């Protein structure tokens, strides 16, 4: 199976779901990486964000959000400093109920850097 960049997800044999956003340039307004409606089953979902730090500087603000049915499931916003520049976010793992709408977004205060998102969902 080939996984092409898309804001949606793909299903594979066995009912599991996969998604890859491709790479997006970060801007000061939220960039949508993935936006989809979960299939009609429960899924243990894992999301990994990859940040290209090459043009992000100390003092800039980076944020990302995982939204499920209009509610913020996870939000992280921080000022880039010498201690965290280059760090990749931890993997997020949660269970998504059937037919829920999921949206993953990110922003960066100075319009620098880029980000991508990979998703794997295991049908429970």
Language-model-detected regions and their locations in the chain:
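Beta-strand-centric surfaces of beta-sandwich/beta-rich domains
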Residues: 1-124
């Amino acid at each position: 199976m080939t996984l092409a960049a898309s804001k949606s997800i793909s299903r594979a044999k066995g009912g599991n779901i996969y998604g890859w956003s491709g790479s997006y340039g970060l801007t000061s307004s939220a960039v949508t990486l993935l936006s989809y409606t979960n299939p009609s089953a429960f899924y243990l979902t894992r999301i990994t964000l990859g940040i290209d730090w090459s043009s992000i500087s100390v003092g800039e603000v980076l944020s990302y959000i995982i939204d499920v049915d209009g509610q913020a499931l996870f939000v992280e916003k921080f000022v880039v400093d010498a201690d965290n520049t280059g760090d990749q976010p931890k993997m997020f793992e949660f269970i998504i109920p059937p037919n829920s709408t999921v949206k993953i977004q990110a922003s960066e205060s100075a319009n620098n850097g880029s980000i991508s998102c990979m998703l794997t969902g295991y049908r429970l």
